[in-house]
Amino acid sequence: MADTACLALRLLAALREEEARAVEELLRLGADPNLVLDDGAAAVHLAARASHPRALHCLRMLLRWGADPNARSAEGLTPVHVAAAWGCCGALELLLSRGGDPTLRDQDGLRPLDWALQQRHHNCARVLQELDTPTQPDETREPTETFHVAQGSFETETCQGPALAESSGVSQDSELHVHRAELEVEAVEVAVHPQSSEATENSDYSSDASFVTAVEDSLQPGRPGGALELVAGLWVTRGAVSAGKGAPNCQPQVLTLTARDTDKPVLPGDGDLGALHPHSSVPPMSDLQLLQALRALGYSPGPVTPFTRGHYLRRLQEAQASRADVGHSQELAEALRTGTIPDCQVDEEALAQCFQRLDPLKKWREGITKSSFTYLLLDPRLTKDLPARASSLTLAECLQCFVRAIFYVGKGTRARPDAHLWEAFGYHDQPRKQVCPKVRRILDIWASGRGIISLHCFQHVVAMEAYTREACLLDALGLQTLTNQKQGHYYGVVAHWPPSRRRRLGVHLLQRALLVFLAEGERELRPQDIQARG
């Protein structure tokens, strides 16, 4: 662990000096760019402040070596937050192009756009606001031809000759070649508008090949409409070389696609991406709404661009068509369908272990007193006294009923165990006041004559552990199915796990909470119960 922290500290020092060679060497030695250090941030957060070419090169290198553009600092900040807050538009565009999520909020509930507006970085704000701009409906767009490009690299080939130079306006000394360039986007669709028939008729071709040139494109701050420019840009020229004596025969094999670490030029995961603008039942939505809808279904999409929008729309349509219980994560949907719970006991032990012996001399969120817990609010109108009925139901049926009744997940303390109910009690006799969705649901249950089921789980832990367990449960359940208004915060080792692993742990924790509920029985809290306690 000491060696890991030492490497991470040396990586921070190299980034401050913008020494690209030292950064690369440390990454080769195993330095973790996502490791949150004592100051509460990781190397990728420091690199997100890149504002000129050398610093951007270091950031690009970190991302290439596995830096997470959505890694959380101790305060819940992601590199996208940092770039927006510092006004580093080039870094912001780069992070977004590598999967940075502009919808994530920090521990204060602020998005990257909120930071950009607060700090008056209008160029960054413009980039982020474009993500929430409704796009043109599919029916109004011109038909396109699409090329499907897999993650991989272009092999260099050369085709040169006098006839080519004469027909294209390129000097005889130049070469038409394809640079070897990494494509860092998982799946890209390149739309090519066909030439007009008039242009076709007036041209004499000796070959009908299309030439694709991949050019390394450095991201430029303030580029118009450049909110999500790709690092490896693709320029596509539809056309061919004029015939002439001695003209070389440039065949289509000039372009060779080679997928990384494989012999087949296939897309990772999906294969064919489908049409760029599929005709579907999905209603018109902005790019941000599309991102949020996919995240609610348990996906972790990258940025929505003109290249990827069609793919994400199709994925959303398929998910909505195939899943009756839209909103839950894939992992929870599988558990609800089969009753099979992921075996994550080892992961839960790892989560708890990292909070067992915290250094009391360091500053931790809400201290190190083990007085916190995670709680679930349930609607008794949906549980229908599940503990009494459980013996006649299967595990899958019990879990389905339990999950359907959960409407809020939170973190509480022994000092204020029912703070959420006290909040709702303050509005009990004032129905006309505007309230949040959680309070509205509580008041609705009380108005029906029933009480709230407040299930306390995973008790006697430090606040950061309770927050982490809460975040796992939220990701497994999906915000769309709850009255929670923001994602949770991860701390410790879980902060560095992939989203799918966190969601599996969330399903495991849900099943443990269900067992607590079945053992304790169903108890309702009505307004008079809250008043009596007060």
UniProtKB/Swiss-Prot annotation:
All residue ranges annotated as the LEM domain in the record: 279-323
Enzyme Commission number, as recorded: 3.1.-.-
Expression (tissue specificity): Predominantly expressed in bone marrow, spleen, thymus, colon and ovary. Expressed also to a lesser extent in lymph nodes, liver and testis.
A GO term for molecular function: endonuclease activity
Domain notes: The LEM domain is required for GIY-YIG domain-mediated DNA cleavage and induction of DNA damage response.
Function: Endonuclease that probably plays a role in the DNA damage response and DNA repair.
Protein name as catalogued: Ankyrin repeat and LEM domain-containing protein 1
Lineage: Eukaryota, Metazoa, Chordata, Craniata, Vertebrata
